[in-house]
């Protein structure tokens, strides 16, 4: 008998800082997306894959936070990339924060409901709700906003009810002729992209609000010197000289510390010693 496969793709949508990246990391039980308190940390769509057995493949796509101001400022580039996904995905996760409903949430709902896809209202950060008695009235309020497929309260941070969300989606997967991705993959990111994200996370962690939104990290080379050691060369691109000074710091102290944090994280990821070279350049400058 021919093997049956079940697959489905869910796009994770919401305003900035509602915990989208934390949720995708929990859903696939692996850290592939940067988590930070800084708004607009996620710069592009990131795909995570959760394989259950050898038949079920749950695909999740983390997206940059949506806000009216950010969509306008970026001339819709990242926004268009996110909306382009809507034609090929099966489910939409609208991520909401605790028991609030804002104009931004309304704005996003009005955008995504036009695509006529099943929308799940995911109430995140329930670990921060002091009294769970406030949840039921909020769920009733949400049910009047739209005919949501499901309204599911979760905590991306603690993992509460993540298994319920995963199970609900698993039960709604469709039969497909073959898996979308190989069953040994957790993400569609290549190794250089993962390294770049690890470095960018440490820059965000250390520099915080000092860090320009426009920063980009590109991994140029990963060279295995031997079984126990690798050399990694990465470039941090910024818009202007002032941004370059912020990242480098006085006598190079900031970039050295960021490099040390990134190196330790990379050594943990690769389980080997890492020699990390970081260069900070202005965009459009060739090395």
UniProtKB/Swiss-Prot annotation:
GO terms for biological process: ribosomal small subunit assembly. The keyword GTP-binding applies. One of its GO terms (molecular function) is small ribosomal subunit rRNA binding. It is found in: Cytoplasm; Cell membrane. Residues 62-65 are annotated as: G3. The keyword GTP-binding applies. Keywords: Cell membrane, Cytoplasm, GTP-binding, Membrane, Nucleotide-binding, Ribosome biogenesis, RNA-binding, rRNA-binding. GO terms for cellular component: cytosol; plasma membrane. It holds the Pfam family MMR_HSR1. GTP binds at residues 14-21, 62-66, 124-127. Residues 14-21 are annotated as: G1. It is a peripheral membrane protein. Its main location: cytoplasm. Residues 40-44 are annotated as: G2. Residues 124-127 are annotated as: G4. Residues 207-282 form the KH type-2 domain. Residues 6-178 form the Era-type G domain. Residues 154-156 are annotated as: G5. An essential GTPase that binds both GDP and GTP, with rapid nucleotide exchange. Plays a role in 16S rRNA processing and 30S ribosomal subunit biogenesis and possibly also in cell cycle regulation and energy metabolism. Monomer. Belongs to the TRAFAC class TrmE-Era-EngA-EngB-Septin-like GTPase superfamily. Era GTPase family. PANTHER family: GTPASE ERA, GTPASE ERA, MITOCHONDRIAL. This is GTPase Era. It comes from Buchnera aphidicola subsp. Baizongia pistaciae (strain Bp). The gene is era.
């Amino acid at each position: 008998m021919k093997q049956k496969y079940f697959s489905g793709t869910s796009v994770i949508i919401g305003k900035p800082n509602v915990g989208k990246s934390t949720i995708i990391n929990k859903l696939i039980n692996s850290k592939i997306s940067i988590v930070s308190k800084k708004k607009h940390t996620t710069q592009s769509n990131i795909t995570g894959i959760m394989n259950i057995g050898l038949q079920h493949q749950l695909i999740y796509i983390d997206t940059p936070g949506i806000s009216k101001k950010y969509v306008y400022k970026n001339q819709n580039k990242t926004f268009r990339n996110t909306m382009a996904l809507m034609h090929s995905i099966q489910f939409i996760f609208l991520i909401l924060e605790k028991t609030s409903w804002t104009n931004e949430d309304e704005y996003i709902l009005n955008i995504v409901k036009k695509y006529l896809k099943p929308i799940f209202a995911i109430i995140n950060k329930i670990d921060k709700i002091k009294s769970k008695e406030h949840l039921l009235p909020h769920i009733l309020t949400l049910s009047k906003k739209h005919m949501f497929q499901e309204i599911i309260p979760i905590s991306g941070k603690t993992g509460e009810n993540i298994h319920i969300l995963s199970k609900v989606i698993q039960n709604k997967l469709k039969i497909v002729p073959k898996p979308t991705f190989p069953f040994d993959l957790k993400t569609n990111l290549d190794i250089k992209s993962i390294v770049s994200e690890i470095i960018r996370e440490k820059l965000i962690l250390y520099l915080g609000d000092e860090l320009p939104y426009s920063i980009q990290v590109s991994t140029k080379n990963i060279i295995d010197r031997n079984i126990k050691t690798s050399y990694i060369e990465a470039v941090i691109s910024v818009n202007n000289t002032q941004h370059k000074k912020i990242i480098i710091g006085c006598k190079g102290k900031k970039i050295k510390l960021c490099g040390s944090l990134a190196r330790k994280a990379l050594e943990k990821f690769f389980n080997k010693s890492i020699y990390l070279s970081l260069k900070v350049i202005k965009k459009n400058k060739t090395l």
